[in-house]
């Protein structure tokens, strides 16, 4: 902008409507009613009044005489019958220029400086009510906004030096001015919301996102709907938000419990379903080998094989044709092939299987050394127990063993053989474990069960019976029972 703009004249009948754009109102220049600086527009719907002062007793008061306006010819208005126009006193409040139009009360002003308009408003709220004195000379303030910078109207007889002096004498914009409730002191809506004018086009822009609008009401509604604060109901641990405080309290109780920890990484959660989902999403492709007895997953077959060795310590594999038992499933498979191959062929021929023979029957069951499973080749059924696969093949895929014992897993081709086998179990009786729900028809099976299942919890074993105890004192007390008998 040019430092010395071209000066133009403009006359008006209502000089009190105008003041400069810098926030400082000027006194009308004589009777012409032209202000000394930029034009202002009044935001009030009321037309500001102009005070008429009669020239009475002016000659006796030199201070008043100096304040009288001059006419165009340089003479002062001294005649009593003359009346002249002057604008009312001006107050500057929060960077707004206000014209006084009516009678009001006298207001006390403090000189405390504030860092921002928001702090000024807060300071005025915290101040105690001031003492008000009624006066007819102090009018009510009406808020006035400066108009656009497009107006470039200046009054004549104002040099650039005088403009610079007046700018230097401008009062600080951050002075706190405490006004009473009767005055029109309102914090603008822009000070209550994080809003800015984006550019010269006049769009209101939200500071929290990219939203902008031509109308302030739209932006205000956007802030309320999209950026409503919910910090009071947010969990500090997982940052989850809740609509009410009661829901937040119930959620916080979950974090006080022991979390579920992923065995493959450092993931922790208080919700078991979240842990299951985490394993399925993150570790499912990395852990393809699992144990069918305890559902533990492994990333390699060697780890799974070592895990199976722990299970095999407390289990015995029984032959379905004889009393042979072993702890090695591969040994049981070799035993059936080597010792009972002829019997399998005979049973297969009796059932009319024709040319299927030994190879056809044995090919239905294979042993997977990598995964340590017995696998049915017909449907893929697998188990670590050879007895289970034999039972499955006998029932589902052949007619060799239509009758299978539920206690030991042995199969029989006829009902007569099956009933004889059941009588053998009844004659021996059923042996029950007193420490768990295990039952068997053979005493040796019960002894093996006690040694492998309960030896860790009950290490002290009675040599006279099958009783086991957790400490030596209980065992010594039990041995006294045998001595008395």
From Swiss-Prot:
GO MF annotation: an example: DNA-binding transcription activator activity, RNA polymerase II-specific
Compartment(s) of residence: Nucleus
Extent of Basic residues compositional bias: 1-14
SMART domains assigned to the protein according to its UniProt record, in alphabetical order: ZnF_C2H2
Keyword Nucleus: yes
Zn finger (C2H2-type) start-end: 204-227, 233-255, 260-283, 289-311, 374-397, 403-425, 431-454, 460-482
Disordered as annotated region, ranges: 1-23, 54-80, 115-136
Keyword entries, A-Z: DNA-binding, Isopeptide bond, Metal-binding, Nucleus, Phosphoprotein, Repeat, Repressor, Transcription, Transcription regulation, Ubl conjugation, Zinc, Zinc-finger
Keyword Zinc on entry: yes
Region (Interaction with CTNNA2) location: 371-455
Superkingdom of the organism of origin: Eukaryota
Cross-link (Glycyl lysine isopeptide (Lys-Gly) (interchain with G-Cter in SUMO2)): 76, 177, 181, 226
GO CC, any one term: nucleoplasm
Family membership noted in the UniProt record: Belongs to the krueppel C2H2-type zinc-finger protein family.
Known partners and oligomeric status: Interacts with CTNNA2.
Function: Binds DNA and may function as a transcriptional repressor.
Name the record gives this protein: Zinc finger protein 639
Encoding gene per record: Znf639
């Amino acid at each position: 902008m040019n430092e010395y703009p071209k000066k133009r004249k403009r006359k008006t009948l209502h000089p009190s409507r105008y003041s400069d754009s810098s926030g400082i109102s000027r006194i009308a220049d004589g009777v012409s009613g032209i202000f000394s600086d930029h034009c202002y527009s009044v935001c009030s719907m009321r037309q500001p009044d102009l005070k008429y002062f009669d020239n009475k007793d002016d000659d006796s008061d030199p201070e008043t005489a100096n304040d009288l306006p001059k006419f165009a010819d340089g003479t002062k208005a001294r005649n009593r019958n003359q009346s002249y126009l002057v604008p009312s006193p001006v107050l500057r409040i929060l960077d707004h220029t206000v014209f006084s139009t009516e009678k009001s009360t006298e207001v006390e002003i403090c000189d405390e400086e504030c860092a921002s308009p928001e702090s000024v408003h807060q300071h005025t709220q915290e101040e105690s009510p001031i003492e008000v004195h009624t006066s007819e000379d102090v009018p009510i303030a009406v808020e006035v906004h400066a108009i656009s910078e497009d107006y470039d109207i200046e009054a004549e007889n104002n040099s650039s030096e005088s403009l610079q002096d007046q700018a230097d004498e401008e009062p600080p914009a951050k002075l706190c001015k405490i006004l009473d409730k009767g005055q029109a002191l309102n914090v603008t809506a822009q000070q209550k919301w994080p809003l800015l004018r984006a550019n010269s086009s006049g769009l209101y822009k939200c500071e929290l996102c990219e939203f902008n609008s031509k109308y302030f009401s739209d932006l205000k509604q956007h802030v309320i709907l999209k950026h409503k604060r919910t910090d009071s109901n947010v969990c500090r641990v997982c940052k989850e938000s809740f609509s009410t405080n009661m829901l937040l309290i119930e959620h916080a109780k979950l974090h006080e419990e022991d979390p579920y920890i992923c065995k493959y990484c450092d993931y922790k959660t208080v919700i078991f379903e979240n842990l299951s989902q985490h394993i399925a999403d993150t570790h499912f492709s990395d852990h393809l080998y699992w144990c069918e007895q305890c559902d533990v997953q492994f990333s390699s077959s060697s780890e799974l094989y070592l895990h199976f060795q722990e299970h095999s310590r407390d289990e015995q594999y029984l032959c379905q044709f004889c009393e042979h038992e072993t702890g090695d499933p591969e040994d049981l498979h070799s035993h059936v092939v080597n010792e009972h191959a002829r019997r399998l062929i005979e049973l297969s021929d009796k059932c009319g299987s024709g040319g299927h023979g030994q190879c056809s029957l044995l090919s239905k069951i294979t042993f997977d050394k990598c995964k340590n499973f017995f696998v049915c080749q017909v449907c893929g059924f697998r188990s670590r127990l050879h007895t289970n696969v034999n039972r499955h093949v006998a029932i589902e895929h052949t007619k060799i063993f239509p009758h299978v014992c539920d206690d030991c897993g042995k199969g029989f081709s006829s009902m007569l053989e099956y009933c004889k086998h059941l009588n053998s179990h009844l004659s021996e009786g059923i042996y029950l474990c007193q420490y768990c729900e295990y039952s068997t028809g053979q005493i040796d099976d019960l002894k093996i069960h006690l040694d492998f299942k309960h030896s860790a919890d009950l290490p002290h074993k009675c040599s006279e019976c099958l009783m086991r105890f957790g400490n030596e004192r209980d065992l010594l007390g039990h041995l006294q029972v045998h001595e008395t008998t």
